[in-house]
Amino acid sequence: MKHLVIRNLGPLKEADIELKRINVIIGPQSSGKSCVLKTACYCTWVEKRIELTQTADFFAKGNNFLNELERFHKLKGYIKDDTFISYESDYMMFSYDNATKTFLFNWKNDRWKYRRSKVTYIPAERNLVAAIPNWFEVKFADDNIRDFMADWETARQSTTHNLPVLNLGVLYHYDANTKSDKVQTADGVTLDFTNTSSGLQSLIPMFVHLNYLSVVQVGKSDNSSVTGNKEKIDLTKLVYDYFSPLFGEKVIEDIGGKRSSVVLEINGEAYSMQRSDIKKMDDIISQYIVTDHCDIFLEEPEANLFPPTQSSVVEWLLAMTTGEQYNNLFVATHSPYILNSFLEKKNIPMTLLYTRMSEGQMVIRTATEEDIQGIYDFGVDAFFNIESLG
């Protein structure tokens, strides 16, 4: 389980939350939902970068930690003099206090049990890829929208077959010859993606992207590029440098003859190691190279969708999250249909968060089991009676 604390960021006075496999946050517009979603996404990415490089030096330097958050997630004007963020998982703990310009970091005992994830932020503006036919020719800032567009480009080019979109009777595919997106509607008519309904223009980018991640990318190693190969080389050196002195026995002199062990030279020192220990190190490297799961941060999955379709989206998200291949999901929503569809599912590891005004400032609260049961059993409308929660 992850623990996230945010103080004095944008409209938020405080958020102190435990994150589970599935997390849903509700609240009025401009109340801090996206601040929480973006910060949780950012901290998950920071954790990944620290694990893959085995150092927090970049984020500890100057104001890099907050600068990267502000740049990537478009939070200019949200950072305050006393902004504070802390994050803790099974692998590490880090925090940044803007009042003292202090970044603190500690490894946890499970440091080397980390498994690589694909961290993805799906913005509410995802329909831009349909609304702007030549979006790939437009220069965008290097932020979460541009990052999603890059991921969309990879996903669409990999979807050259007809992909059924939920249970809508709609098929999507990418035409490599014309470099365009095609959608076959329920009545058999094929349209350019830019000419489809607003609902499909919001749904298809999310659906195709997440389908690609869950079906294609999970289980793949990131060594197909120069960057990926360099990362693997660097990680191999980091792991061998760290574990060889722990697993191996330093060789003082070469006694000759046959050995049951293998001698490795690490940083000018020779270590005699069992093959089983070498396998342990190679397994750790594999955990860092091969994508194990996805950490999905999703804004407004309900955008422009009819209520029954919203429920179908939740069914699909849950199947992808709690099925044979687990993923982590964090959703920000304004829709009671999205919320109720999540709450209908019993025995899933879910946290429901909501924003609330306290002493003139916004705070984040976690709904109690009683709150959740009341919403589900008695039809309490959490969106109109949010002040009754907690």
Model-flagged regions — what are they?
Residues 312-317:
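Conserved hydrophobic alpha-helix in the ABC-type ATPase nucleotide-binding domain
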Residues 81, 110-113, 318-325, 337-390:
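RecA-like P-loop NTPase motor core
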Residues 1-42:
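Pre-Walker A-like glycine/lysine-rich segment at the N-terminus of P-loop NTPase domains
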Residues 293, 325-330:
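Loop/turn-to-beta-strand initiation segments
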Residues 18, 40, 44-296, 344, ...:
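Phosphate-coordinating catalytic segments in nucleotide- and nucleic-acid-processing enzymes
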Residues 332-334:
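H-loop/switch region of ABC-family ATPase nucleotide-binding domains
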Residues 299-301:
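Walker B catalytic acidic pair
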Residues 306-307:
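Conserved D-loop-proximal element of ABC-family nucleotide-binding domains
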